[in-house]
Curated annotation (Swiss-Prot):
CDD domains: PRTases_typeI (cd06223). It catalyses: UMP + diphosphate = 5-phospho-alpha-D-ribose 1-diphosphate + uracil. One of its GO terms (molecular function) is uracil phosphoribosyltransferase activity. The gene is pyrR. InterPro entries: PRibTrfase_dom, PRTase-like, PyrR, PyrR_bifunctional. This is Bifunctional protein PyrR. A motif (PRPP-binding) lies at residues 109-121.
Amino acid sequence: MGAANDAVDGRELMSAAVVGRTISRIAHQIIEKTALDSPDSPRVVLLGIPTRGVILASRLAANIGEYSGIEVDHGALDITLYRDDLMSKPPRPLEETEIPAGGVDDALVILVDDVLYSGRSVRSALDALRDVGRPRSVQLAVLVDRGHRELPVRADYVGKNVPTARSESVHVQFSEHDGHDGVVISR
């Protein structure tokens, strides 16, 4: 997706304002679907898939805390060594896995990624999660679902469904990494 300040030419799908509203909406959906304010609600842990999934998880946790008054643990789950394309792509540096102090055992873990495409990153995340602990259940939240699944994966929380051609790319941009917020589609 490029390093910070790399320009991505293409058509804007979501402005910074729309990205903010979309994250807010996903946070509200998580609060409602998990019944976070109920005493029977499981502990919720948001685990972002590096790089932009970690940023999205952090923003979702902040929004959930603001709207519900409940602090939600969040962290990062590196999937590099669990990918099925390690031999066919250039080497990637390992990212940091940061599991909250309470761990993930018996928690509702929500995996968070910026774009859902083939489903292979999610499969890798499930494999990585298995090595970290045993959650009660696992859900998936994504900012953009662009279709073209190769594995039977469906997100529980989707910011925007964007039908794309396989020749197109969807680039999510966050100010923490890219200098500004937005979503761009390019060829």
